């Protein structure tokens, strides 16, 4: 049964790759794939540029930092110093900089500015604007799907998944949608009640969500996320991850400072089987920096 499934999967992959198409259609498919590959690369480069380079929230007055922890303020001061703005504080669209600000900063206007900066990445009608890139990707994806015999791109994507059809996906999402919406409405009501209690004369907006969700959580459960941070120091997280991998899969991670890395912040580990056989090299790269895609790798 497993071998039959493997053969079916391989055949389907060839079919989805255009193996059954006549030669001229295969050439057309290759061209579409090349264009989509270049556009996808361009999309990512634009988002990366907008995230890392083209937006900075510069704070001049210390009172505008109210609500932020000392380590977040210190990191913003260091970012400002590196940008040649010593004595100020700079927040970027990188998650470790942006999320604490949205979650804890009391200055609502600055939260709005930072949130909208993130929301509008690659949407400023400049060299990094993605509107036309997205339109081109949508058009080419539709062409590729139809070339391969599918009615649309959605049908092409889910054909080899468990859902099989876009209609099944819609039905599944609709089952989730109603209870999720009710839960979100309840959370919104709790946050609006907190705003009203504090004398706020405004309706909850998107840039308020993290801030008031944290306040409601703290009021309801006496839980302050900032107090959890000492338990999740990077060294502890790495040790925990390695421990779990060893328990689940029996593999070992051995730190290898002798192996060259592409950046001084990256760390190299050799991964071995339980008996010491070499599996491969694993790089860990946790910190944001200019030119790097967001997130820990």
Predicted regions, residues:
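Extended, charged alpha-helical coiled-coil/arm scaffolds that mediate oligomerization and mechanical coupling
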Residues: 2-47
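Short glycine/proline-rich turn/loop motifs
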Residues: 115-122, 219-225
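His/Glu-rich zincin catalytic helix
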Residues: 95-99, 103-108, 268, 288
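Recognition helices and adjacent regulatory flanks at domain boundaries
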Residues: 103, 123, 130-131, 136-137, ...
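Active-site-proximal, well-structured secondary-structure segments within enzyme catalytic domains
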Residues: 6-8, 38, 45, 49-92, ...
């Amino acid at each position: 049964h497993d071998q039959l499934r493997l053969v079916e999967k391989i055949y389907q992959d060839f079919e989805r790759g255009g193996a059954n198409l006549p030669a001229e259609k295969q050439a057309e498919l290759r061209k579409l794939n090349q264009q989509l590959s270049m556009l996808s690369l361009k999309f990512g480069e634009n988002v990366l540029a907008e995230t890392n380079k083209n937006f900075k929230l510069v704070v001049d007055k210390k009172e505008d930092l109210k609500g932020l922890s000392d380590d977040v303020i210190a990191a913003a001061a260091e970012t400002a110093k590196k940008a040649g703005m010593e004595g100020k504080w700079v927040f970027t669209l990188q998650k470790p900089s942006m999320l604490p600000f949205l979650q804890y900063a009391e200055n609502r206007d600055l939260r709005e500015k930072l949130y909208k900066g993130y929301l509008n990445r690659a949407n400023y009608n400049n060299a990094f604007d993605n509107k036309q890139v997205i339109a081109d990707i949508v058009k080419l994806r539709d062409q590729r799907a139809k070339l391969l015999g599918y009615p649309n791109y959605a049908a092409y994507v889910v054909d080899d998944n468990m859902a099989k059809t876009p209609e099944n996906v819609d039905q599944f999402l609709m089952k989730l949608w109603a209870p999720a919406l009710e839960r979100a409405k309840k959370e919104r009501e709790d946050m609006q009640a907190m705003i009203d209690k504090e004398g706020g004369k405004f309706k909850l907006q998107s840039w308020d969500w993290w801030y008031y969700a944290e306040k409601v959580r703290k009021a309801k459960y006496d839980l302050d996320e900032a107090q959890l941070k000492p338990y999740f120091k990077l060294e502890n997280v790495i040790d925990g991850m390695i421990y779990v991998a060893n328990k689940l899969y029996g593999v070992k991670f051995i730190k290898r400072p002798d192996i060259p890395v592409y950046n001084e912040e990256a760390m190299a580990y050799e991964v071995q089987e339980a008996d010491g056989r070499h599996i491969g090299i694993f790089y860990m790269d946790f910190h944001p920096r200019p030119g790097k895609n967001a997130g820990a790798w």
